[in-house]
Amino acid sequence: MGLELYSKVEEYFDFQDEVKLLHATFLGLIFEKNLDDIIDIGCGQGAFIMHLLANGVNAYGIDLSVEQIKICQAYDLNADVLSLAEVNEKFNCATAIFDVINYIPKNDVEQFFKDTSRVLNDDGYFLFDVNSFFGFEEVAEGSLNIDIDDKFIGIDAIFEEDKLKTDITLFSKTKNNLYKKEEGRITQYYHDIQFLKTSILNAGFEIENILDFNFHTEEEADKLIFICKKK
């Protein structure tokens, strides 16, 4: 329920500039490596796939959210409701952008990386970002209320014990001028850099580089971008 509810309210969050810069950064890496035939894991509504296609790069997307994939398919994008473990094709590059890895519990991360390796050709690349501790504690935590037209959205995010728990409340006006209430929670997990390095190496990748991604301040990175290559 949490992710499906999030898909209904995501467009009202002020993430556009950050996502635009993040997508531009990933596109730059893809052009630099001259990569094609890409699987975008956790593709959401398909914005990054659209950027890839607009630049002549073949792309396929998967997501666990039915609502998100409906939007992808409405745009005639090649995307399916699938878990990574269900994918049988091979690709030259995999991307997981805007917190995808942070939605995976620590005990499942290494298997996720192994599943990613399985769907890549030899020497294929895996590009992903993760939130830094600063990104969770100083940027993501907090409360937000959005009151627009026929909707009221309440967000309350608390970061403790390496978990960001975000409670979402949505009130939607019905035809009878009544309000329908929906509630859900999404949980994200902080993964420290040493844990990620170990998990990536165990999954059969080498790490070419780890980049700082600074959006809110130049002093501390909001996210880290990992550039990994299948051995």
Task: Kindly label every feature range from the protein language model.
Residues M1-K33, L35-G42:
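Conserved class I S-adenosyl-L-methionine
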Residues G46-A85:
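Class I SAM-dependent methyltransferase SAM/SAH-binding core
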Residues A85-A94:
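A short acidic, Gly/Pro-enriched loop at the edge of an enzyme's catalytic core
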Residues E110-D122:
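A short glycine-rich, Lys/Arg-flanked "PGG" loop and its adjoining helix->strand segment in the class I
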Residues D123-V130:
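Conserved beta-strand signature within the Rossmann-like core of class I S-adenosyl-L-methionine
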Residues V130-K197:
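SAM-dependent methyltransferase
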Residues E219-K231:
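Core SAM-dependent methyltransferase catalytic element
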